[in-house]
């Protein structure tokens, strides 16, 4: 056992890494929490459209501490995405994209996480779950020639129905373990060459053991976030949820405004800003894939852009675009929100071409 622990305990770590490097460990804690709470929820859930909604009510009311487990699982997804977006932003700000294999594995993790979260959003079988599933899976029909066939295959019929829920529950149970496998690969690749640092310089002459210095730092970060998370799940457990999802799914009544969970809203706003269906789907996928471009477009002569003022300006414009798109994704498609979505989408993609020129 000590042979397994010692390499981690004595891991040479740059002495100047800040609390922005804590999010890796926080994401690991989030993933384990989601898997454990998900297993307990799966024991009491029924993947049938006639009972799924009532089973959520049963878990909340009748299962011992069921309300707490569900609240941790539902809000844990939001905390997970907050951390992963900060983690990606930190990676861009401190030039972690020069570690190409690590960066590519990280993007794969984001896609796996988004797929897992989307499938989980469908399971309660509320109004927004049903219509969200209908709208988002319908996007697959935009694929030329095979689109409709693939959509019907995913649905298990000609509409979102019982077969769809069973399939989504199965995949939602399976994907976290694939995600865990990708995370292990990601961590292995990071520790193969060592971590980056704020200055972007070689720290081979100034490294210290991971334990006790960084174990204490990581534990402090975990306890601080645990306090904030505890407040969220106990005082305001439904703060991140959509009010429409407290109504049982009804295919005969369309909600006035269909939207996914808040962490997908930036991509959803990009999708809606393109008037063509296929173009919108391509823009949606590219909103994540384009982050990979930094691996190939950034100038390797500068190992850090921390002291580059123009880079910082472009970076914060990109961050503001992300927040603006998240806000616009929750708004109805009408003036001025539709126009603002188009402008912000153009600026968002433009930043990925402008930043390498800094």
Curated annotation (Swiss-Prot):
Pfam families: Cytochrom_B_C (PF00032), Cytochrome_B (PF00033). A ubiquinone binds at residue 191. Its main location: mitochondrion. The chain crosses the membrane at residues 23-43, 67-88, 103-123, 168-188, 216-236, 278-298, 310-330, 337-357. Binds 2 heme b groups non-covalently. One of its GO terms (molecular function) is metal ion binding. One of its GO terms (cellular component) is mitochondrial inner membrane. It is a multi-pass membrane protein. Its cofactor is heme b. Keywords: Electron transport, Heme, Iron, Membrane, Metal-binding, Mitochondrion, Mitochondrion inner membrane, Respiratory chain, Transmembrane, Transmembrane helix, Transport, Ubiquinone. CDD domains: cytochrome_b_C, Cytochrome_b_N. It is found in: Mitochondrion inner membrane. GO terms for biological process: mitochondrial electron transport, ubiquinol to cytochrome c. The keyword Transmembrane helix applies. Heme b b562 binds at residues 73, 172. InterPro entries: Cyt_b/b6_C, Cyt_b/b6_C_sf, Cyt_b/b6_N, Cytb/b6-like_sf, Cytochrome_b, Cytochrome_b_C_euk/bac, Cytochrome_b_N_euk/bac, Di-haem_cyt_TM. Heme b b566 binds at residues 87, 186. Component of the ubiquinol-cytochrome c reductase complex (complex III or cytochrome b-c1 complex) that is part of the mitochondrial respiratory chain. The b-c1 complex mediates electron transfer from ubiquinol to cytochrome c. Contributes to the generation of a proton gradient across the mitochondrial membrane that is then used for ATP synthesis. The main subunits of complex b-c1 are: cytochrome b, cytochrome c1 and the Rieske protein. Heme 1 (or BL or b562) is low-potential and absorbs at about 562 nm, and heme 2 (or BH or b566) is high-potential and absorbs at about 566 nm. Belongs to the cytochrome b family. This is Cytochrome b. It comes from Rhipicephalus sanguineus. The gene is MT-CYB.
